[in-house]
Amino acid sequence: YEKNINIIMGNQIATSYVRKRDCYNQLKGFMQHEYPGKICALYGLRRTGKTVMMYQYISELSDKDKEKTVYILCLRECDMLELRQAMEDLYDKGVRNFFLDEITEVTDFQKYGNTFSDYFAAKGAKIVIAGTDSLGIMLAQSDILYDRIQMIHTSYIPFAEFSKLIENDSVDEYIEYGGTLTKSPYKTLQASEEYQNTAIVGNILHSLEKSEDARRYGAAITELYEQNELKSVLNKMINKFSYYTTVKAVNKCFKSAPLYSTIHNIQEPSYVSLINTEEANQATKNALGIKDLDEMQTSLSKRHLDELKNYLLELELFLEIPSYISLNSGERSEDLEIFMQPGMIYAHSTALIKNLADDSMWKDTCGIADRNLFILRADHFVKGILLENIILAETYKTFQKIDLDRYYVSQLSITLRNNNQHVEADMILVDKQKGESYLFEVKYSNQIVIDQTKHLRNTDFLEYIDENFGKVKSRLVLYTGASSKQNDVLYLNAATYLKRLSIVSNTPRPEIKQLLNENCNTSKPNLKTTSRKKPRKL
């Protein structure tokens, strides 16, 4: 079995990585406590620290415990029989801690993976697994490893953890590269596409193929459809987030010109077609093999489309956030969807914008005289949209963890019936137990601009919030400047806020006031009066 398995004993393992993932203590807890008949899985996308965590734990063991520990790297074409033989030989030699990396390369893992729990773990061995095709681990958890596995999720890397690990507090750094622990996946569009096609699309398809080989009944989705068709659909599902972000950013660049007027006269889902000119996205479509919408409609059934979308959710690629027009009456709005890899969206969106800027006909239509200025402005707006998404997603996940029944976090965009005003909040946080609401605007700017708070100062809007969500307790602007307070509106630095979220989420019985600390500079900076924001449609 040596040709398909690399075996490294614990006393041969060393690592130079000192800083640890926040979830490292979960791994440590599993290894140091008894969980009879259970194994542990590090579950997440590539380049989120799974292998490093294994190395870190092994390297910190005593010399005696290292002799009882092994790291096994499974190579392609390895099967469970070979792996079991290797593990039995090592067990007979006194090894009790098994770290099995790239477990999803084992061809029949989803058939016989319960060998780890039902045989080795039952004999007192500690087993930790990880794999590039992480969806395969999830599929095994729902089948042969049901109730036999403790999952440690690594895909989600919040800002506070990201900044700690790379020692950089820059919000820009997180927007441009957030999602993994290295810049390389999102440094260029080509690198981003390669990561998307291997870490995500390939992950799903490889896992499905191996899972369906293990099925005894039911239609196999990889047999019903061509591989390229499935690849196309998955990429389109992912890329819709980039297209939506790009269109919104370009919209914000224009206050006049034919395209801006046209965009504002049609429904939001349709205007993607106006900006996705052949010149703007052909390179991206070719690289990712994306088919046109009419071709897509004649291929996968709705049931199978929903199944693929669910796999993206299982990989923690995007977040669904419930949204209400009135929380008190229960009147719903369309749920929000936020993609959890900002670096991927940023790489795609900036490439699309540059392609647009190189289209002479498009530039003439839009009246773009300065290409570089357009790209600079559009980049600014892309980062603004992504900052909104980051703050909303992290706040939602934090308060779901604290008390999912007590707190409500979402966005709000409505037209008031009494005066037909369109009003909105980039984020609303409600403490349902206390009947209190907190309203937020999010700005990718270090300037305090009076117009930024026009919705927060709208008395009709505030009355609506009081009646439908809870009495407005505080109004805030999260931005990239220094914390300050202006006319009862608190300005908080976005990076500071995101770091506080991390602290609050790990504090017993936390209070919202810990997050919205008003002990800040109350001096009066030079105020600007120009800012305009296109209303968000939910």
Describe each PLM feature range:
Residues K50:
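Conserved lysine of the Walker
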Residues Y119-Q141:
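Sensor-1/coupling segment of RecA-like P-loop NTPase cores
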Residues Y1-M31:
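N-terminal pre-Walker A segment at the start of P-loop NTPase domains
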Residues A140-N276:
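Interdomain motor-coupling "hinge/lid" segment immediately C-terminal to the ATP-binding subdomain
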